[in-house]
Every structure is written in C-alpha cells, then in structure tokens.
Amino acid sequence: MAATRIAILYGSETGTAQDFANILSHQLRRFHYKHTVCSIGEYSAQNILACQYLFVICSTTGQGALPQNARQSPQGKVEGTLWSVLKRSSLPPTLLDHLQVAFLGLGDSSYSKFNFAIRKLHNRIVGQLGAREIFPRLEADAIGLAGSNAGNGNGIELVYSEFEKRVLSFLNDQFPFMTVNGEQVPREPIATDIYLKPEYYLEASGNDKGTASVPCTFEGDSSVKYGTVVTNKRITATDHFQDVRQLVFSSQDGENYYPGDTVSIYPYNTDADVQAFIDTQQHWASIADVPLQIKTPTSARGICDGGLVSPLTLRNLLKYHCDIVSIPMRSFFMKTWTFAVDHERLPDGKDQLQQQRDKLREFAESEDMQDIYDYCNRPRRSILEVVQDFMSLRLPWEYILDYLPHIKPRFFSISSQPCNKDIELTIAIVRYKTILRRIRRGLCTNYISDLSEGSIIRYKVQYNDLLPAGKQDRPVIMISPGVGLAPMKCLIYAQLFNPMLLFFGNRYKDKDFLYADTLQKWADENRIKLFVCFSRSPDDSPGLKYVQDAVWENAREVARLITEENAVVYVCGSSGKMPVQVRLTLCEVLKKWGNFPDDKASEEYLKDMENSDRYLQETW
C-alpha cells in the first residue's frame, strides 16, 4: 500500500467504525483528496512517517482493547503492525511531530471502559509521540449518556456527522485550491449525483464454463479453519420464547483455547434471499452464474474477510460475502441513490420515479437522521427489503462489493473445556417481530439454527487474553444471566480459581435454566458455589428476581472475598441495565460490608479493580 499524505484509519469490531471511515473516504474523494483508507492493522507502520494528516475512527472491545483489525494484520499477525510498533518504548517523543491528527471514538457507556481504545491511541500518538491534534477528540456513546452526545438525544451518527464537518472544513481551509492540468483552480466537490467508481470492480472473466455444480472454496485467508458439526441441540423448552442452542463442532487439529476466548463463525445468506435479491435486479439474471474476476490495481486477497469465494460469480458473492439482510447504513444510500432510474417497473411511472429518487437522496444526504432511522432501524428493514421497496433502483452488478456491506464473522464465547478438540458454543437464536409485524431472524443465528450433524462450518478462534496474569489461585465471583454463562462454563472447567462463586439467572427454572444438571453436579461436588434466581418463576427463587438480588443476599461473603482475598469479579451477559445494576449493587455491598464510608469510596475501589484487571466485564 503506497504512502499518502492523508490517511483514514479505523478499528472496527461490528463494522460501524469501518462504515464511517468509508463514508469519510467517499466525501474526501468528492473533494479530490488522494488518501488511504484501511484498518489500523493493515496500515504500514513505515507509511505513518510520510503521512501528514491522519483521521482515526475506532471502537472499543473487550476490556478496553482495540478491535482485532486494529491490533492484527489481515493475515492475523501482530508483530510489525502499526499499533505494535507505536507501543515500543524506545520510540522518541518527537517521532510523530510532523503529523496532524483527529480522533473519533465509538463506544457504549454501559461499559466501564468507555472509549478506552480511542483514548489509548490518542494518548500514545499525541501525548507521547508528538503528533498535533487538529481538533479535540470526539467520543460517541451508543446509549447517549456520555461523551460528545451526552444527554442531547443525538445518536452516534450525528457525532460522526460533526466529525466529518470538522475534517472537511480543516482540509478545505488548508487546501482551497487543487492542480488540474498544471493549473491551480478552486477546489470544488464532484456533484453527488455522479457515482464515484471504486478502485476495484467486477467484470466477466471470459470463462463461460458452468459453475452451478462446482463446490465452493475460499482463497486468501489461511487462518480460517473448517469444523464439522457434532451437535446442534436446543437447550431451552420448546414452548419458551427464546431458542438457545448448544452447538458443538469438532476441529480438524484441535485448538489451544482458554477461558474468555471466542470463536468467529462465517455465516452466509440463504439461497432464497439471494434469488430474491437477483429478482429485484432483472438485468442480473443472465450474469448471475457467469464466472467473474475482480479488477484491482493491487491484490484482491484482502477484499473480503475470511477469503474470497471461488468460483467467483455474482450469485456466490451475494451468498457468501454481501450482507443483503443487514440494516442499511447511510453509506448504502449515498452510493446507490443515483441508480434510481427505472420507471418502467413502477405503477405510477416517471412521477413515482422522481419521488423515489428524492427519498433515496434524502436518506443519503440529510443531516437529520430521523427519517432513515424510522424507515430502516425502527422496523429493522433489510437492504433486500429496501431494494424491493424501491423498484426504480437499477444497480450495476460490477460494483456490488463497493455499495453492499460485506458479511462479517460473528463472535461467540467458548463454553467447553479448554483445549478440547470439540468446541462448544452457547448461542441465543435471534428471532423477533418488528413493528411491521414481520418475523426477523439474525443472519448468523438463522444460519446456525439450520446446521445439522455433519455440516461443515468455517471459523477462527480469537485469543482474547481475558484472564489477568497473576490473578489466578484466588476467588472468582462470576455474575452471568442468560447465555452470559458460556465463558463462565469454560472458566469453571479450567479450575483456575478457588473458590468459584457463580450467580446465574434466567426467566424460568423449568424452561431456560441452561446446563442445569451440569451446574448442579458441580455444586454438589463443591467445584462451585451456585446461586440462582428466576425472574418469572419467583417460587423457585423466593425474594430473588435478578442476579444483583442474589449478590445482595450474599453481600457479606462477596465483600469479604473482594476486600480480604482480592477476588476477581467477572460479569458477562446482555448490555444495558444488567451490568449497570450489578455495578451499583457491588458499590452498595462494598459500602455496607467492606468498610467503605460512602459511594465515592466504593466506586473508586471498583475503578481500581478495573485498572488492575480484577473487575472484568463482557457484554453485548
């Protein structure tokens, strides 16, 4: 990757930071700025010495860590990546004094280490290596309680919009002119109704051999492995609203995984959804199964996470790489509204065509995100449904890898015994009704629910280094409602802590008490101390509705283990109210039974526990 003086770097776990980086790149291209856009892990450490203007967009994962694609190269290597180089203690404090930089953090303040990743980057790049800040760091909060959008009702999209405005204002002030044919002319943006062709695109390969019966393989990512499904069993009652699966698959060579490590699964779309998408684009029918090739100035190896499908056809790309059932982000509308040109399929012809163009353009360009939120996010409307609604869209198949988002692997905590050849995951199947009264099923959990014994899955093990060094052989207090039990189960198998207290909660004892027999057996064998509560069957846990109630009932023992025996606290489960309520409860426990005089003192103690890796939280 050649060095440029402007670079946009992202660290993204779920794809949001990457999407914002791509939107910013799109805007810079409109203003004729040559630049690089890529993950932090992909960016050459050498190139930062030639870079003059750097824009960083990064989310936070795990215990305040940078996302994987910020820490590792696309090939899974850590050594030699930008972040690994920047962390070297031998670097001089003036290394980056040539660099001007701006930061945008994406976080969730229900996590204690809110936006830690962007703060780490900021502290190292600006505070310790001498880069100059263009404008103060912006931090977006997904729940709107902290950071740059604290209490103002604005979502992360509007924080990004402010970031984009400041970036463009700065660059356009710095470079009001550009060179065209050797002359200096005012810098004017390319009109938004002109599609900016991407660096890579598809074209027919000229090989007209049939592909329908050719089995698919994936090229370009040797770190992806194949597993064979051993068990895919529902472990909640059939009349319970939540379908939770115990998915077990065997690895080819065994895996050296440990408590807290995760597996990333590579799902794909159903054949029915792929065909439905092709049906919305009638001009694709004749090309859908024709062999294609990617035209790119560099290499196509890193274009799709997990390796590129072969045979490379439009149908296979839609099935394995394009996330057509995801909720569209603004970048989708920015790149596609100009293709609303087909009035022949509209009942009201050209009049309706103009209406559709106007609405799509509004989604693409309006700073008020309420309309796009109401149309896409509230009803969880998918890209497939959008193109079915807007039949005027005549999308060019050559650019689908540019305007359609790519399928990302989904991460699940390992719940089986460490270093076992058979890997067990505990997965809640996503299925719900929207305000449109339509059934929604998550892409990955839909894929998982259809797996049967003998099915082959593609996966990677992600090593998260969750367990704090030197913190073992001491008590651990595990707090985990629902499928948050998964990593706790792996931790109990490992027997690294003693004693082990498990506070587990769910709705009903007879419907969703996950792994009840196993947990009770461990409790009978004194491997764990088990405390359970069931929010919808109070007779089975009198006086205890939620996990924090069970913690409070055992407050004296919890406080003693934390303050006298330096216990580790591990909270895992759904984000939102649970981790907040658990933390508040622990503050009260410490204040009453840990001899802390007030809320401030107990909260400071919890913060010290976080900083020393004794308070661990993994929520989603």
Curated annotation (Swiss-Prot):
GO molecular function, one term: flavin adenine dinucleotide binding
Its EC number(s): 1.18.1.-
Signal peptide interval: none
Catalytic activity as recorded in UniProt: 2 oxidized [2Fe-2S]-[protein] + NADPH = 2 reduced [2Fe-2S]-[protein] + NADP(+) + H(+)
Binding residues annotated for NADP(+), in chain numbering: 535-536
Binding-site list for FMN: 12-17, 59-62, 106-115
Cofactor(s) required, per the database record: FAD; FMN
Residue intervals of the FAD-binding FR-type domain: 222-475
Biological processes annotated in GO: cellular response to oxidative stress; iron-sulfur cluster assembly; nitric oxide biosynthetic process; positive regulation of nitric oxide biosynthetic process
Entry's localization field: Cytoplasm; Mitochondrion
Domain Flavodoxin-like: 6-168
Positions of FAD binding: 380, 410-413, 442-445, 620
Lineage top rank: taxon: Eukaryota
InterPro entries hit by this protein: CysJ-like_FAD-binding, FAD-bd_FR_type, Flavdoxin-like, Flavodoxin/NO_synth, Flavoprot_Pyr_Nucl_cyt_Rdtase, Flavoprotein-like_sf, FNR_nucleotide-bd, NADPH_Cyt_P450_Rdtase_alpha
Keyword annotations of the record: Cytoplasm, FAD, Flavoprotein, FMN, Mitochondrion, NADP, Oxidoreductase
One Pfam family recorded for the sequence: Flavodoxin_1
GO cellular component terms listed in the entry, alphabetical order: cytosol; cytosolic [4Fe-4S] assembly targeting complex; mitochondrion
Sequence similarity: Belongs to the NADPH-dependent diflavin oxidoreductase NDOR1 family. In the N-terminal section; belongs to the flavodoxin family.
Record note on quaternary structure: Interacts with DRE2; as part of the cytosolic iron-sulfur (Fe-S) protein assembly (CIA) machinery.
Function per UniProt: NADPH-dependent reductase which is a central component of the cytosolic iron-sulfur (Fe-S) protein assembly (CIA) machinery. Transfers electrons from NADPH via its FAD and FMN prosthetic groups to the [2Fe-2S] cluster of DRE2, another key component of the CIA machinery. In turn, this reduced cluster provides electrons for assembly of cytosolic iron-sulfur cluster proteins. Positively controls H(2)O(2)-induced cell death.
Protein name as catalogued: NADPH-dependent diflavin oxidoreductase 1
Organism: Eremothecium gossypii (strain ATCC 10895 / CBS 109.51 / FGSC 9923 / NRRL Y-1056) (Yeast)
Taxonomic path: Eukaryota, Fungi, Dikarya, Ascomycota, Saccharomycotina
Gene: TAH18
